[in-house]
């Protein structure tokens, strides 16, 4: 599989969820105090992301 979510700890000791595609980080979340919160963030992205609109503010 070329894409996946990773959970890592940042320098502050917080749990951060990363979305990685072909070994390249595409985006990451804020830091969370618990691993469970980072997992909840991943589930929210998976559930709500496919229906998210694109808001192009470049024009």
From Swiss-Prot:
<protein>
    <recommendedName>
        <fullName>UPF0339 protein CC_2965</fullName>
    </recommendedName>
</protein>
<comment type="similarity">
    <text>Belongs to the UPF0339 family.</text>
</comment>
<dbReference type="Pfam" id="PF07411">
    <property type="entry name" value="DUF1508"/>
</dbReference>
<dbReference type="InterPro" id="IPR036913">
    <property type="entry name" value="YegP-like_sf"/>
</dbReference>
<dbReference type="InterPro" id="IPR010879">
    <property type="entry name" value="DUF1508"/>
</dbReference>
């Amino acid at each position: 599989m070329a894409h996946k979510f990773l959970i890592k700890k940042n320098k502050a000791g917080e749990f951060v969820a990363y979305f990685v595609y072909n070994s390249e980080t595409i985006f990451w979340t804020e830091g969370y105090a618990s691993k469970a919160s980072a997992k909840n963030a991943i589930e929210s992205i998976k559930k709500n992301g496919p229906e998210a609109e694109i808001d192009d503010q470049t024009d």
